């Protein structure tokens, strides 16, 4: 049997980021699938194959089981490092910034779609989090544009990062190919850059993390 193929937007002129099965911590128990876009982890997770030190980048991740921490990390650090790391644990409504924790909204549900936008162009580099089409503004997910972001360190390369907040959570990333695992996005959002297909509107000025972006 030939099976069912999943369409990809990758081509010789542009390749989107995936999770990197080689960029993991010793002893981690990770299972990658769907072109390294789906991950079941019982360790320190994984990071994106691509990173940048300038530009504005957007990605989505669907948490098939709640308990995944997602965000961004300084790629010059070890994956286990707290420095240069910003992760959101939706199930516990907790934001981890360089190892310190703070409450962040209310708990999410399994199959919610997390939106992550990192701005590496502004004078103060920042990362923003949204859920199911609404951006967090410090008190609620109720705005069409990201703001009140978490500050990142300057002059370094950042990539996207996922980790386990509980035992063996599952996450399906969409870096622009338009799928969560083997399920296509249900309604493509707007994307002025024209690079990548996402469930929700890509914020103005942002694009997919890819070799063209």
State each model region's role.
Residues 1-213:
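PRY/SPRY (B30.2) beta-sandwich protein-interaction domains
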């Amino acid at each position: 049997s030939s099976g069912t193929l999943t369409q990809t937007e990758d081509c010789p002129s542009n390749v989107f980021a995936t999770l990197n099965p080689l960029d993991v911590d010793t002893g981690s128990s990770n299972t990658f699938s769907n072109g390294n876009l789906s991950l079941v982890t019982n360790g320190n997770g994984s990071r994106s194959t691509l990173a940048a030190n300038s530009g504005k980048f957007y990605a989505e991740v669907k948490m098939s089981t709640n308990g995944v921490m997602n965000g961004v990390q300084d790629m010059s650090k070890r994956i286990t490092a707290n420095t240069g790391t910003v992760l959101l644990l939706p199930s516990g409504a907790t934001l981890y910034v360089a190892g310190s924790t703070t409450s962040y909204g209310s708990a999410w549900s399994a199959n919610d779609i997390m939106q992550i936008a990192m701005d590496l162009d502004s004078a103060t580099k920042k990362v923003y989090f949204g859920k199911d089409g609404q951006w967090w503004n410090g008190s609620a997910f109720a705005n069409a544009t990201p703001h009140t972001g978490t500050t990142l360190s300057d002059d370094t390369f950042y990539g996207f990062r996922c980790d386990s907040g509980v035992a063996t959570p599952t996450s399906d990333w969409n870096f622009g190919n338009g799928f969560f695992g083997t399920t296509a996005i249900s309604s493509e959002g707007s994307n002025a850059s024209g690079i990548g297909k996402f469930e929700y509107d890509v914020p103005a000025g942002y694009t997919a993390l890819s070799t063209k972006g």
